[in-house]
């Protein structure tokens, strides 16, 4: 991708991952999600339905089994695992900015590039609104990537993940 700033090159990436991801009628892997979860995560219905991150060839959809699987690592002709991409730089700038207008501009730049209309731009007038906007964008932009986990951990977000139970860790 033209947006990868730093990544790892993995020789024969597709071959190495194909055992973990089965597409087509088999879908024997656990690395898939049901269609309703895909629609919830990527807001495919309603005001953000034009978001390209869940359209086209981003996911393999098996409508008969009502499940979908991300193709970001399977169909990766450059054999690159991204470590940092341009959208993440915009999100970091959004979070770091003290200016609410500038902060919103950073997050909305990515949203607009992903096909979401400027009329649906989000506001970052408070810290809570900024984190809420970034939460939704990290969830979509970094689906299946460590950056999303890092964002959740950094902000202490627990128990709010789609189809993930809340777990209390006890120090022993």
Q: Where do the language-model regions lie?
A:
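Short, cationic low-complexity segments
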Residues: 27-42
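Acidic/polar-rich alpha-helix caps and helix-coil junctions
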Residues: 1-23, 45-172
